[in-house]
């Protein structure tokens, strides 16, 4: 009896479980295979499979040979689901190296800006923007290293930029906000379709920017402060911290008032804020008071093993009503001043990651389960020779591979000839 032939559906089912790099190799087999693997059906199937195995993405930044250079290395490791059921001691996960990212003759980020959130992530792509000198804003695929240089902008003093994704039109957009008292205009750029051009955009409230951005269901959120601009903000009553909400699709701004400095996260598809008892506004310390942030955190942020955390989840956007929760836990290796909030897993664990990686010390991520009020630490191994000295680490949760990202034509080769990007005036 002859064996039954393998159906194309079974082949696609098997291949949808492979890494994206492996799938891309099959494009070269024949035009028919390239057509099959480039079809919307297979891309959706692959994304569905990939979404069931999210990973932690690590962007490790190291000071380059020149004073301003910053060299990036991208790794990923399995994102553990319900790690508490496996062990009460330290677990171990191995990081997979993807790419060293330092395009020739291209300054992409001033090294000393790293502590002031100079990197963003959205649906498989990394956005790195420069804040000083002639640093270039760009978007890259952290798995392959393919990237696109965005048109540069003249900015007065320090500007801030954010990265978001519109799930309806499936478009990536970068938002650049100017310094509130300086010349120029805030702008937005759409990536993935048409020419790369910054378009002028207007925000009705002047505000200082106080946090990195988080994009949830097509809305980009970040923390702002109107304290210094109450006289020019018209009828808006607020004179303190607020959450700025930018709709990526409509490109309109709305605002949510909050009482104090906080950290923003995506909690199971809802906006949530985290309050630490001893949290500090690093922008206020550095830019207004001239205080060294690292030194302040070292000397003033609680170094005790007992941690207190408040989580507010936005239950009603229109009424601005919050569901409020408070937690306390103890762990001898978890120190507030050494970690940053990486995000929240699909099952609701809040993930914390060490902010720096040192070759002489273990590198940990921590999974906090609010329902159990318990913390599980996981040692990440595998950075190896990439980390020969203390480096800054940005960690992102829920990283999945998407074949649509691989097909973006504006992502060039790893080291294309450098073309000077267009500059925009400050008008």
Curated annotation (Swiss-Prot):
> Which positions, given as ranges, span the membrane?
none
What CDD domains has UniProt attached to this entry? F-box_AtFBW1-like
Q: Sorted alphabetically, which InterPro entries does this protein's record hold?
A: F-box-assoc_dom_typ3, F-box-assoc_interact_dom, F-box-like_dom_sf, F-box_dom
- What domain of life does the UniProt record list for this protein's source? Eukaryota
| UniProt domain F-box: residue ranges | 1-45
Give the SMART domains listed for this entry. Answer: FBOX
What NCBIfam families does the entry give? F_box_assoc_1 (TIGR01640)
What protein name does the entry list?
F-box protein At2g16450
Give the species.
Answer: Arabidopsis thaliana (Mouse-ear cress)
């Amino acid at each position: 009896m002859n064996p039954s032939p393998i159906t194309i559906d079974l082949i696609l089912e098997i291949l949808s479980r492979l890494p994206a790099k492996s799938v891309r190799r099959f494009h070269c087999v024949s035009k028919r295979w390239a057509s099959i693997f480039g079809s919307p059906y297979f891309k959706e199937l692959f994304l569905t499979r990939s979404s069931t195995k999210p990973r932690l993405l690590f962007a490790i930044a190291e000071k380059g040979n020149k004073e301003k250079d910053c060299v990036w290395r991208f790794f990923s490791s399995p994102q553990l689901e319900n790690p508490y059921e496996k062990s009460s001691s330290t677990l171990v996960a191995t990081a997979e190296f993807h790419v060293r990212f330092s395009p020739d003759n291209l300054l992409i980020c001033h090294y000393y800006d790293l502590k002031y959130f100079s990197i963003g992530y959205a649906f498989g792509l990394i956005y790195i923007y420069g804040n000083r000198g002639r640093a270039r804003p760009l978007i890259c695929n952290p798995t392959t290293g393919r990237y696109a240089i965005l048109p540069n902008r003249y900015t007065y003093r320090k500007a801030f930029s954010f990265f978001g994704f519109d799930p309806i039109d499936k478009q990536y957009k970068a938002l650049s906000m100017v310094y509130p008292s300086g010349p120029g205009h805030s702008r937005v750029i759409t990536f993935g379709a048409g020419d790369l051009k910054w378009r002028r955009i207007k925000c009705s409230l002047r505000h200082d920017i106080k946090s990195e951005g988080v994009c949830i269901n097509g809305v980009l959120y970040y923390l702002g402060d109107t304290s210094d601009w109450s006289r020019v903000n018209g009828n808006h009553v607020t004179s303190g911290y607020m959450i700025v909400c930018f709709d990526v699709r409509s490109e309109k701004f709305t605002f949510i008032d909050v009482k104090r400095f906080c950290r923003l996260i995506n909690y199971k598809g809802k906006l949530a804020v985290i309050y630490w008892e001893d949290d500090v506004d690093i922008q206020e310390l550095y830019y207004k008071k001239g205080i060294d942030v690292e030194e302040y955190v070292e000397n003033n942020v609680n170094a005790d093993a007992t941690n207190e955390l408040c989580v507010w989840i936005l239950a009603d956007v229109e009424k601005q009503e919050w569901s409020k929760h408070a937690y306390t836990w103890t762990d001898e290796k978890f120190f507030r001043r050494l970690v940053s909030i990486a995000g929240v897993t699909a099952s609701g664990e809040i993930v914390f990651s060490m902010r720096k990686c040192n070759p002489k010390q273990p590198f940990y991520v921590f999974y906090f389960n609010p329902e159990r009020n318990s913390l599980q630490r996981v040692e990440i191994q595998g950075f190896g020779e990439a980390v020969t000295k203390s480096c800054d680490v940005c960690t992102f949760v829920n990283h999945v591979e998407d074949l649509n990202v691989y097909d973006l034509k504006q992502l060039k080769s790893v080291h294309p000839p450098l073309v000077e990007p267009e500059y925009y005036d400050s008008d």
